[in-house]
């Protein structure tokens, strides 16, 4: 079998899908994208095509290493996202060719179902209590929301209180019947992160995500020493080498690589294994589309330390399409009590409505994250 063609499709709300075709008629799907940089990743995908077209798709490890190492300059968000999407598609092809789900190729199941959580609120979160109430009726008991809006490097007690009051209201409304993670989203500098963690500790969040930016990873062990709240990070880390350094330094209780950013299935299986060696949980980042979610689930199902899976049904970003709109076999992704069962179909187990996707590609989205500014006019972290 040989790879013959790579085709990319843009689709609302902010996704890029990749179709990899072979001379035997088996096709694989991937989702290579950086939110807000889809066209940059698309260009990288087609640049990497020269390494894979004409090659045997079964040699996933060799193709991955070639895409990563053949260029003198390597790594980073764009290139690793392009590799990720191609890698996902190669695993999809291999599973379909052999008639088994990808998790069987990775050694088989360690669990029968994977617990997921729901996003509530938005960039500037509001109506969180009502959303949690609605989702609890659907069987979900674990949630995540943004913890702050803009926050200066050194900010006021008012800014801290605003974040804490919101969390207090949620805990008061639901008691300990729910769990929630709080996403600092890299908006908080190290000095304020320490203050916020101290004030949030009485409300027992499940985790705090991106307490500081990945560029400030040296603060993870210092912050962890000041709180009992597990710290999570990793959506803006793109290889096992970055995770290696963070895990060696300590401080992180849960790693969150993105299967569409951090080299795909091949790389993230390794990241999960390294994290397990450090007794650190694995909870892939995935506010993206169905192929990305399917890839995450296959790694979750073979990773003993997988604890939670993010998924984007109803997320505030999904304007123009929701998670399963381009999926034919929607029932395979159905959540029961907040968990998804092992996907039964060969490959990644997601059947894409290609006709719908082609129509979406005729009017491609141009999503960009908001640009925020502080009251003094300086740019703020979104």
From Swiss-Prot:
Active-site residues from the entry: 185, 285
Biological process (GO), any one: amino acid catabolic process
UniProt remark on cofactor binding: Binds 1 Mg(2+) ion per subunit.
Entry keyword set: Lyase, Magnesium, Metal-binding
UniProt binding sites for Mg(2+): 183, 209, 235
EC number: 4.2.1.6
Swiss-Prot/TrEMBL catalytic activity: D-galactonate = 2-dehydro-3-deoxy-D-galactonate + H2O
Disulfide bonds: none
Annotated metabolic or biological route of this protein: Carbohydrate acid metabolism; D-galactonate degradation; D-glyceraldehyde 3-phosphate and pyruvate from D-galactonate: step 1/3
Extra information: Reaction proceeds via an anti dehydration.
NCBIfam families, per the entry: PRK14017.1
Name of the protein in its database record: D-galactonate dehydratase
Lineage: Bacteria, Pseudomonadati, Pseudomonadota, Gammaproteobacteria, Lysobacterales
Gene that this polypeptide is encoded by: dgoD
């Amino acid at each position: 079998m040989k790879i013959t063609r790579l085709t990319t499709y843009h689709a609302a709300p902010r996704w890029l899908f990749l179709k990899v075709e072979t001379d035997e008629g088996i096709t694989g799907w991937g989702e290579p994208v950086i939110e807000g940089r889809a066209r940059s990743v698309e260009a990288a995908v087609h640049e990497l095509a020269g390494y894979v077209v004409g090659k045997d798709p079964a040699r996933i490890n060799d193709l991955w290493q070639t895409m990563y190492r053949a260029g003198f300059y390597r790594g980073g968000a764009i290139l690793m996202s392009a590799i990720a999407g191609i890698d996902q598609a190669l695993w999809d092809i291999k599973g379909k060719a052999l008639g088994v789900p990808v998790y069987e190729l990775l050694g088989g199941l360690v669990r029968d179902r994977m617990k997921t959580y729901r996003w509530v609120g938005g960039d500037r979160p509001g109506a969180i209590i009502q959303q949690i109430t609605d989702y609890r009726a659907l069987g979900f008991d674990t949630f995540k929301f943004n913890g702050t809006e803009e926050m200066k490097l050194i900010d006021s007690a008012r800014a801290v209180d605003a974040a804490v009051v919101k969390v207090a209201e949620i805990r008061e409304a639901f008691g300990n019947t729910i769990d929630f993670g709080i996403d600092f989203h890299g908006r908080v500098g190290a000095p304020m992160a320490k203050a916020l963690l101290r004030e949030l500790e009485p409300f027992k969040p499940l985790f705090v995500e991106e307490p500081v930016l990945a560029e400030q990873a040296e603060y993870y062990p210092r912050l962890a020493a000041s709180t009992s709240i597990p710290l999570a990070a990793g959506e803006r880390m793109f290889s096992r080498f970055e995770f290696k350094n963070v895990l060696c330094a300590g401080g992180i209780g849960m790693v969150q690589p993105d299967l569409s950013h951090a080299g795909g299935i091949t790389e993230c299986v390794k990241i999960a294994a390294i994290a397990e060696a450090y007794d650190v949980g694995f909870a892939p980042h995935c506010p993206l589309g169905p192929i990305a979610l399917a890839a995450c689930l296959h790694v979750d199902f073979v990773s003993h330390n997988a604890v939670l899976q993010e998924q984007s049904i109803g997320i505030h970003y999904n304007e123009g399409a929701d998670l399963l709109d381009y999926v034919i076999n929607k029932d395979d992704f159905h959540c029961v009590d907040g968990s998804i069962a092992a996907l039964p179909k060969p490959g990644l187990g997601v059947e894409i409505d290609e006709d719908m996707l082609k129509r979406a590609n005729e009017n491609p989205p141009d999503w960009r994250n908001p640009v925020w500014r502080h009251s003094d006019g300086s740019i703020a972290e979104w």
